[in-house]
Design a protein with these regions (language model features):
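Structured beta-strand/loop patches that form or line metal/cofactor-binding pockets in enzymes
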Residues: 1-43, 52, 322, 326
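Hydrophobic faces of well-ordered beta-strands that scaffold small-molecule active sites
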Residues: 47, 137-140, 163-167, 187-191, ...
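Metal- or metallocofactor-binding catalytic centers and their adjacent structured scaffolds
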Residues: 6, 40-118
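Extended hydrophobic packing segments that form well-structured cores
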Residues: 348-362
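Active-site and channel-lining beta-strand-loop segments
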Residues: 35-47, 332-334, 340-343
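Conserved, mostly hydrophobic/aromatic
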Residues: 3, 44, 68, 107, ...
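Shared catalytic-loop signature of beta/alpha-barrel
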Residues: 66, 205, 211, 219-339, ...
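Metal-dependent enolase-superfamily TIM-barrel catalytic cores that perform enediolate-based chemistry
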Residues: 125-235
Length: 362
């Protein structure tokens, strides 16, 4: 089966997070931009992927169509790992992180979806043995900066069936509100790289009091694995990291430096499904659990479920807790009894209805 065409489709989806106005990269943040990748084959099969977008969507879209697609059109797709390696080698001079890898990731996911459909098998069956099809989920909250809203959103998440919550707060009163709203259930904290080593260490007693399941990316830069390794020992709190890392190579550095308790690869950033599959294997061989970063609503979310099915160690699936105008997969809007179930269809498992999404195309 050969690749006939590759197209990047950008959707701008209004959302509601239930809080105050948010400024993101200098603008009011009112919509999410999704870069959806459509691959068509010579057998008439369509595969769907997702590349990281947000405010970088224009650059990623150009990279998909002008850098990645020309290297793949007409190629046989029986050996996707080989194609992935060819892409990475051909494009490495443009960087091994960021726009280039986001573009590769989206296309690679679409290739696996198409291949799975051609073979009438879900992606996880093309890669290995399924170990699980039901995954614990957590509600990943917006950064609100308001203790009252945070406590309310935590309680709302629990009412919706989630049994674990992640905050994106940095102020003590906001973190305390999250713990109050979550009760004794698991609470994670993603700070998005705001602090120095000294600032993080100064918060040790407070953070320990919060009984965090993990502390995520406390320091800048996120690739300062030497500092993370020190904090992992000194804080006595599990450290998680990885949403800002790309390729198996960078995760090997992270793990070999004993920087983390949990790794958090993002399938729409790291290089796609096979790259993340290699990361999972390496992490689990080194007794590190994978807690995938998946604050996404499109094919990237389903790709994560396909990979989670192959994990031998326990995991959590992240769900960005906000309402978008039109769900890609309505059955996955909320966790059922705190869990998500792996879809059973070929490829990614299910297809979205593009007719319902097309009005958001830009």
């Amino acid at each position: 089966m050969k690749i006939k065409s590759i197209k990047a489709i950008t959707l701008s989806m209004p959302f509601n997070h239930g809080g105050k106005k948010v400024i993101f990269h200098g603008k009011e943040w009112k919509s999410l931009e999704f870069n959806i990748v459509k691959v068509e084959t010579d057998k008439g099969i369509t595969g769907w992927g997702e590349a990281f977008g947000y405010t970088s969507w224009k650059s990623v879209k150009i990279a998909i169509e002008d850098m990645v697609a020309p290297l793949l059109i007409g190629k046989d797709m029986a050996d996707i790992p080989k194609l992935l390696l060819t892409l990475q080698k051909s494009l490495h001079l443009f960087g091994r992180y960021g726009i280039t890898m986001f573009a590769i990731s989206g296309v690679e996911i679409a290739l696996w979806d198409a291949l799975g459909k051609e073979k009438n098998k879900p992606i996880h069956e093309l890669l290995g043995k399924k170990n699980n099809d039901l995954f614990k989920a957590y509600s990943s909250l917006f950064r609100y900066g308001d203790p009252k809203i945070i406590e309310q959103k935590c309680k709302q998440s629990l009412d919706d069936g989630y049994q674990a919550i992640k905050l994106h707060e940095i102020e003590n009163d906001c973190i305390e509100a999250g713990r109050e709203g979550t009760g004794n259930l698991p609470l994670m904290l993603d700070t998005n790289c705001p602090w120095t080593y000294e600032e993080t260490l100064s918060k040790k007693e407070f953070l320990k009091k919060m009984k965090l399941t993990w502390l995520e990316e406390p320091v800048y830069p996120p690739e300062d694995y030497e500092t993370l390794a020190k904090l992992k020992k000194e804080l006595e709190i599990p450290i998680a990291c990885g949403e800002n890392a790309c390729t198996e190579f960078e995760f090997k550095l992270m793990i070999n430096q004993e920087a983390v308790s949990y790794v958090q690869p993002s399938v729409i950033k790291v290089g796609g499904i096979y790259e993340m599959f290699k990361i999972i294997k390496f992490a689990e061989t080194n007794n590190i659990s994978v807690m995938p970063h998946t604050a996404y609503f499109g094919p990237g979310f389903l790709a994560t479920l396909q990979l989670a099915a192959l994990m031998q160690r326990d995991t959590y699936i992240e769900r960005f807790y906000l309402d978008i105008d039109q769900e890609f997969y309505p059955n996955f809007k909320k966790a059922i009894n705190g869990k998500f179930k792996l879809p059973s269809g070929p490829g990614l498992g299910i297809d979205f209805d593009y007719n319902k999404l097309s009005k958001y195309e830009i």
